[in-house]
Amino acid sequence: EDIGYKKDKGSLAFGKKVTLSRRPDATPNYFYELLNPQDVIKTRRFEDVDTQYDFIAKQIKKNITEDELDPDDILVIFPSVIYAKSQYQRFAQHLARYSISSMLAGVTNERDIFHIPGSISCSAIYRAKGNESPMVYIVNADCCYEGIELIKLRNTLFTAITRSRAW
């Protein structure tokens, strides 16, 4: 409960199922005033990586031109630490087609800088910890669907989701 959640059912014991929900007092007022809760977290399935990257690049362009977000209000998270750099390089090409400036935190800029005015921030999951943005996109989240140490993969996805200030 110290981090804004309450247990609805189940047990927090290892290997047990549990259902958590956000406490109403732990959610900023603007969440209810300005946002439709059903639109806050959206999931979408893509046939291939380039289709995903192009869709997200278009959405980011819309966020900047129509939704009144500054580029540095937007964070793109790559859950796979191993592939984040190569995935970012491919994703950045899609952003460039829409004249969107970006950086991969700690790789394409100084290590201690996470946000640059006029540029969207992209990050591997561990670099994103402790940093938040009003708008967060999680790309290639399918890497958290199955595999060895599934609980760590799910925690990775949860960490990515909680990088949004709306959370």
What are these regions (language model features)?
Residues 1-167:
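The feature marks helicase ATPase cores and/or their adjacent C-terminal helical subdomains
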